[in-house]
């Protein structure tokens, strides 16, 4: 038995090393692909090529990696807190609430600093997530599919309110930009808030065991001595902050927090401390693939990364829902 059990601890490390090994060539491709050619040879002799790399390509690649990792981690946290594998910030009204808060502050204080806009979006996301948590508690636990469907309806209601406000305030174009989820406008000096999202994802790793226990439910958590309310609050604040930071910087990116944790869970199981680094790396890698595809499919034009991932994510979401329904 000991011989059979010995290889098990290495499995998570292998998946993490594989994910990291794939990220390196993907990041290199991302640095070289864009509206203008950037040959490797020119980087040593052409100052303009170096400037493009430093001002545009490196910030964009970093923004994609940080966003993918943070949104994937936010998704797995939300799934544990709600105890449902079919939820993420985009299916619980969190993203829509953040967008509503961003729209409100843009309407009332158009010249507000980006940090103020982020805080307004975070406050709205926090309130929106809290409302969803209250709604989810009223749904019987065995109604697994009803929770994400209710979240989609709730998010749709928030989006309808945001659209109405945008039309009345003449901000419909802004709303369209925030919904697109694209990285073409990322430059040095315009993405640095995403490092905070990455920091929150890293901080969540140190609370992985607490999140795992919280995923067992309130009563079990309290019996095990967990401060359930504090863990729940930390998780909701983390998810809300990550969602608002991403929306303020690049716009809405649906399904990352739903698809990635489910795919990793099928490969590694549900040990969050072991799987969370792989979830972050997989989220970063998948979003980077979608961003690269968006740049090359209609070159020299771009398809937003959110659109590309939305197609992939929607297909996986339907597969998971239908698979769950077929399995009873």
Regions found by a protein language model. Give the residues of each.
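Alpha-helical transmembrane segments in inner-membrane proteins
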Residues: 2-328
């Amino acid at each position: 038995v000991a011989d059979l059990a010995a290889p098990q601890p290495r499995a998570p490390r292998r998946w993490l090393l594989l994910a990291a090994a794939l990220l390196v060539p993907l990041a290199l491709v991302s640095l070289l692909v864009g509206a203008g050619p950037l040959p490797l040879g020119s980087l040593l002799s052409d100052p303009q090529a170096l400037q493009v790399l430093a001002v545009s390509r490196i910030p964009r690649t970093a923004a994609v990696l940080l966003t993918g990792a943070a949104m994937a981690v936010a998704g797995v946290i939300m799934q544990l807190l709600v105890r449902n594998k079919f939820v993420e910030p985009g299916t619980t009204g969190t993203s829509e609430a953040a967008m509503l808060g961003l729209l409100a502050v843009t309407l009332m204080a158009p010249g507000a600093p980006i940090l103020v806009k982020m805080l307004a979006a975070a406050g709205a996301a926090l309130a929106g997530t809290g409302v969803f948590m209250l709604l989810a508690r009223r749904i019987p636990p065995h109604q697994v599919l009803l929770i994400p469907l209710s979240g989609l309806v709730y998010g749709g209601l928030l989006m309808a309110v945001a659209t109405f406000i945008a039309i009345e305030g003449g901000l419909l174009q802004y709303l369209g930009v925030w919904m697109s989820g694209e990285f073409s406008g990322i430059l040095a000096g315009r993405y640095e808030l995403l490092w905070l999202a990455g920091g929150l994802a890293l901080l969540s790793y140190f609370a992985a065991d607490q999140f795992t226990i919280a995923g067992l439910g309130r009563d079990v958590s309290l019996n095990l001595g967990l401060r359930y309310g504090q863990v729940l609050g930390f998780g909701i604040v983390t998810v809300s902050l990550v969602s608002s930071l991403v929306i303020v910087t690049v716009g809405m990116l649906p399904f990352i927090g739903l698809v990635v944790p489910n795919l990793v869970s099928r490969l590694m199981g549900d040990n969050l401390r072991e799987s969370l680094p792989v979830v972050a790396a997989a989220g970063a890698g998948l979003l980077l693939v979608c961003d690269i595809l968006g740049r090359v499919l209609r070159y020299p034009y771009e398809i937003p990364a959110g659109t590309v991932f939305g197609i992939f994510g929607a297909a996986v979401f339907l597969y998971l829902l239908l698979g769950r329904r077929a399995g009873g």
